[in-house]
């Protein structure tokens, strides 16, 4: 649980800056949140915030449901895009360069194992999931292993010096899996949870809704781990574990789009204290994203109409987090500046 003992002291420091109360809006809330996190286990509230080694972890895996035509792209594109990430040619690479963030890809279960690469971490749970519309996507053992792998990954990242994490994902068919998870756990209507992903046709959209409904009917109202077994994805399961690992290491995560937010939601159902370490980057165009953000009482920093994934929204929001850190650290107080109000 996040120790809020220094909350008033932190807020006073923010309020004494040379600005009207609350004038920096959400940036003030970001600074306050980070200050609370970085003041954990301290004798007093931190007066200087720091961001060290901000890192994007892109969790990648394939989905059996993709063979049913629920996406504009075939499953082969998962592997192709992973290679694009590793070659530095994707949107996430461009944004990581502009924001000076590191990026690594985690192979959680792409159809084919990938050649070794310095920025590729192999944590394969299998060669893609089963078709969630017809049978359990994975075994209970794979769920438990995936959560454990995600936790251990974050422990290593934090112990190597990272103190701000961002998660992204890549997996053809994973909006179907995320929508099914959300519908099964929340009870929200299918039409609220299922969106058009990368831009499917009306016919594909109706098929996607029908297939997701079949999966949800097997696990509606079940426990989170059981829902993950029935309709989850290998990358989603590992992200759930990663969010739990971030809580264990008291490290904030800048949460990206729909799929990542659903993983965060699942993690909070398993361990409610996870919520204390989440910052929400943006609201995407995917139908269910706004709904799950509301369930998490989240206030995303951006609303840019994004629907790409990869962690792109999280990295774009990193600049705002840096700005929050800068004003907290260096903006003068009224007393320092000799300003009287």
Curated annotation (Swiss-Prot):
Keywords: Cobalamin biosynthesis, Glycosyltransferase, Transferase. The keyword Transferase applies. Its EC number is 2.4.2.21. The active site is at residue 310. It catalyses: 5,6-dimethylbenzimidazole + nicotinate beta-D-ribonucleotide = alpha-ribazole 5'-phosphate + nicotinate + H(+). One of its GO terms (biological process) is cobalamin biosynthetic process. The keyword Nucleotide-binding does not apply. Pathway: Nucleoside biosynthesis; alpha-ribazole biosynthesis; alpha-ribazole from 5,6-dimethylbenzimidazole: step 1/2. It holds the Pfam family DBI_PRT. GO terms for molecular function: nicotinate-nucleotide-dimethylbenzimidazole phosphoribosyltransferase activity. InterPro entries: Nict_dMeBzImd_PRibTrfase, Nict_dMeBzImd_PRibTrfase_bact, Nict_dMeBzImd_PRibTrfase_N, Nict_dMeBzImd_PRibTrfase_sf. It is an enzyme of class 2 (transferase). PANTHER family: NICOTINATE-NUCLEOTIDE--DIMETHYLBENZIMIDAZOLE PHOSPHORIBOSYLTRANSFERASE. NCBIfam families: cobT_DBIPRT, PRK00105.1. Catalyzes the synthesis of alpha-ribazole-5'-phosphate from nicotinate mononucleotide (NAMN) and 5,6-dimethylbenzimidazole (DMB). Belongs to the CobT family. This is Nicotinate-nucleotide--dimethylbenzimidazole phosphoribosyltransferase.
């Amino acid at each position: 649980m996040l120790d809020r003992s220094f909350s008033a002291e932190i807020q006073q420091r923010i309020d004494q800056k040379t600005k009207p109360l609350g004038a920096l809006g959400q940036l003030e809330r970001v600074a306050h949140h980070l200050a609370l996190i970085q003041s954990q286990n301290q004798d007093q509230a931190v007066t200087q915030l720091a961001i060290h080694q901000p890192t994007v972890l892109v969790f990648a895996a394939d989905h059996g449901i993709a063979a049913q035509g629920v996406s504009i792209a075939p499953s082969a594109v998962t592997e192709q895009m992973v290679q694009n990430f590793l070659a530095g040619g994707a949107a996430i690479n461009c944004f990581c360069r502009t924001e000076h963030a590191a990026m690594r890809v985690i192979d959680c279960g792409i159809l084919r194992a990938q050649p070794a690469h310095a920025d590729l971490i192999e944590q394969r749970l299998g060669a893609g999931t089963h078709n969630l519309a017809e049978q359990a996507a994975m075994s209970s053992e794979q769920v438990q292993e995936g959560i454990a792998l995600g936790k251990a990954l974050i422990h290593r990242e934090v112990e190597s010096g990272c103190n701000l994490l961002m998660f992204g994902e890549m997996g053809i068919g994973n909006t179907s899996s995320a929508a099914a998870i959300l519908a099964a756990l929340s009870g929200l209507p299918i039409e609220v949870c299922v969106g058009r992903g990368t831009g499917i046709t009306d016919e594909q959209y109706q098929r996607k809704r029908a297939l997701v409904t079949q999966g949800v009917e097997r696990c509606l109202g079940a426990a989170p781990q059981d829902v993950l077994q029935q309709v989850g994805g290998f990358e989603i399961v590992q992200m759930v574990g990663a969010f739990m690992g971030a809580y264990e290491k008291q490290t904030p995560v800048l949460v990206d789009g729909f799929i990542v937010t659903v993983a965060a939601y699942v993690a909070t159902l398993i361990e409610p204290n996870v919520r204390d370490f989440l910052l929400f980057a943006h609201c995407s165009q995917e139908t269910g994203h706004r709904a799950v953000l509301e369930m998490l009482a989240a206030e995303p920093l951006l609303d840019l109409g994004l629907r790409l994934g990869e962690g792109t929204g999280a990295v774009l929001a990193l600049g705002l987090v840096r700005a929050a850190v800068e004003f907290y650290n260096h903006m003068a107080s009224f007393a320092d500046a000799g300003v009287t109000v």
